[in-house]
Design a protein with these regions (language model features):
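N-terminal Skp1-binding subsegment of the F-box domain
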Residues: 1-38, 44, 50-54
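Charged/polar low-complexity intrinsically disordered regions
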Residues: 41-258, 262
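Charge-dense, extended regions
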Residues: 195-409
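Histidine (H) residue identity feature
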Residues: 5, 10, 32, 41, ...
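Residue-identity detector for threonine
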Residues: 2, 21-23, 45, 181, ...
Length: 409
């Protein structure tokens, strides 16, 4: 009998506890019977211990919600509302442990967390230099702990959103739009919600890049109608891919060549979707009908944000935001500057106007040196007026070439 066979199962379990991800656990239990036997007797404990080391600090409430979103029925509206209420309660109480879920839900969470770590670092490497140059801001070369938290939270909320709301027809009807606003978005301030748009935009342009490459150059895709005039936020195939989950999106982004991209991007979704159920149209609901008029309570509805009082802006803060995103934070100051000239009645999720702001993730970073609000507003306005930081492939084509590509399909 070999040494490893003489080890007690609780010792073997403690070895498995040290693995970094559930994927590594799967490899281990297939490699030796003693690991399999130990896992079979202690599956819940081993999975929770691995995940407890993998979950970033202060994000256990979101991890539990993400676990639950993997198993809840999105068409059961009461269950979805209860899940989101529990998320609020968990954030307030900040538990440091995971609740009991099926092993496949633990595996899904572990894959999402592993994807988030890589996606976050890639986003920082691209967006932070853009922010520093656009706002002439002093900043360290990497993200601070506070900024990493914001990005982790935004990615996790994005995945929860996809699990609960970006669902195909055959799953049933999702939560109605007003309840998505009320239960998913409204417990957070507008600037914390707009942090999700920063990670969304990063994912959107990466998927659009892969989609454009495959749709333009793959022979089989010649059978598929493609309208190159569609922006990524309204292109059904790009939007469908964006709802497939962070691990799939990471695979698309990391695809090293055309053939890998082609394998990852099917010509047709395997299940039918309503466009309003896809990511961008869901994110539009982060602002309620009539926008922020109730909270800011101006003297008349057409007043612009810049004319509202500080006391009323305080009402937009939410307890779930955390101190790093309160009314003294840079994300708040930048959000107010970006939207300063918009009517209180119509502060909107405006893809055309704000995609450059999202590309530099301006609602994520902290300014190391304070800047006057007028200066920040001026630089923000310039971002709205310049060409996109990341133009689509077809932007370099002549109009006749686009028409020819569409008509020959």
């Amino acid at each position: 009998m070999t040494f490893i066979h003489r080890l007690p199962l609780h010792i073997v379990s403690s070895i498995l506890d040290q693995l970094d991800t559930i994927t590594e656990l799967g490899i281990a239990i297939r490699s030796h019977r003693i690991f399999y036997n130990s896992f079979k007797h202690n599956a819940q404990t081993i999975c929770r211990n691995i995940l407890s080391s993998q979950i970033p600090p202060n994000l256990f409430p979101y991890a539990n919600a993400l676990l639950e979103s993997n198993v809840v029925d999105p068409s059961n509206h009461d269950s979805v509302k209860d899940l989101l209420r529990r998320l609020e309660s968990r954030i307030k109480n900040d538990p440091k442990s995971l609740e009991r879920f099926p092993v496949n839900a633990y595996a899904a969470l572990s894959r999402a967390l592993a994807a988030i770590e890589i996606l976050r670092e890639n986003l920082v490497s691209e967006a932070l230099p853009l922010f520093m140059s656009s706002f002439e801001a002093d900043h360290a070369s990497g993200a601070s702990q506070q900024e990493v938290f914001r990005l982790n939270r935004a990615f996790m909320r994005y995945q929860i959103m996809c699990n609960l709301f970006c669902v195909p027809y055959d799953v049933g009807s999702r939560l109605v739009d007003e309840d998505i606003t009320r239960y998913f978005f409204h417990p957070f301030s507008p600037w914390v919600n707009e942090q999700i748009l920063c990670v969304y935009r990063y994912l959107e342009r990466k998927v659009a890049e892969a989609y454009d490459d495959v749709a333009a150059h793959d022979v089989d895709w010649g059978k598929v109608p493609v309208e190159w005039a569609y922006d990524a936020n309204v292109c059904p195939m790009i939007q469908w891919n964006l709802g497939r989950g962070l691990p799939v999106l990471l695979s698309i982004i990391r695809a090293a060549n055309f053939e890998e991209r082609r394998q990852l991007l099917p010509m047709h979704p395997p299940r039918a979707y309503n466009m309003s159920n896809l990511p961008f149209q869901t994110l539009v609901h982060m602002l309620p009908e009539n926008s922020l008029i109730k909270a800011l309570n101006p003297n008349f509805s057409q007043r612009i944000l810049d004319e509202c009082t500080e006391a009323n802006f305080q009402r937009l803060c939410q307890p779930l935001d955390g101190v790093q995103d309160d009314i003294s934070s840079t994300p708040y100051l930048l959000w107010r500057a970006v939207h300063s000239k918009e009517s209180v009645f119509w502060v909107a999720v405006d893809w055309e106007l704000h995609k450059n702001h999202w590309d530099c993730a301006c609602f994520v970073w902290d300014l190391e040196k304070p800047q006057r609000s007028a200066v920040v507003q001026e630089r923000s306005n310039e971002l709205s007026d310049i060409e996109p930081f990341f133009p689509r492939l077809q932007s370099s084509w002549e109009h006749d070439d686009k028409l020819r590509s569409e008509n020959e399909r």
